[in-house]
């Protein structure tokens, strides 16, 4: 979101992407803190029972950004297409996927100290989805009224220099 904000055509979109991008950094901090608290006093047996022996082998009890399969985070997960409509739709999808992940975590969580902050993060993903929906609506209102499919209006303005 912080990368996409620089090419947003309006102040609302730039501010929204900036605010949500910064909030997402705080979400990462919350998740890292929860993981640190859960790992801090874990025994080797508990780490193995949780299926975290590969993580422990590589990182000890340090927090390292990776998915549930142990695949390290990479910027390949960050989408920025150069098309503001495509970016906002992608952002909406990302928020829905995060919300769904939190739904699944809540189904598994037995500890209220885990469930409560996850519930908060889930609620924020819903709000982000709604704000991105508003941004999409505003962008579409600014497009030519004949642009039914809400594609990037700048696409047809680009020169093809290879002809």
Sequence positions of predicted segments:
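Non-heme di-metal
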Residues: 1-163
């Amino acid at each position: 979101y912080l990368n996409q904000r620089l090419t947003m055509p309006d102040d609302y979109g730039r501010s929204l992407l900036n605010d949500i991008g910064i909030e997402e950094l705080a979400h990462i901090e919350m998740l890292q803190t929860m993981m640190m608290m859960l790992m801090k006093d874990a025994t080797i047996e508990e780490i193995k029972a949780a299926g975290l022996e590969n993580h422990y082998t590589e990182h000890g009890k340090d927090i390292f950004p990776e998915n549930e399969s142990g695949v390290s985070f990479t910027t390949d997960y960050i989408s920025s297409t150069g098309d503001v409509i495509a970016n906002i739709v992608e952002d909406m999808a990302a928020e829905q996927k995060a919300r769904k992940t939190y739904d699944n975590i809540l189904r598994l969580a037995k500890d209220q100290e885990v469930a409560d902050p996850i519930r908060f993060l889930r609620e924020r993903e819903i709000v982000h989805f709604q704000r991105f929906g508003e941004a999409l609506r505003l962008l579409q209102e600014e497009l030519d009224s004949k642009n039914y499919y809400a594609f990037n209006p700048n696409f047809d303005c680009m020169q093809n220099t290879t002809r």
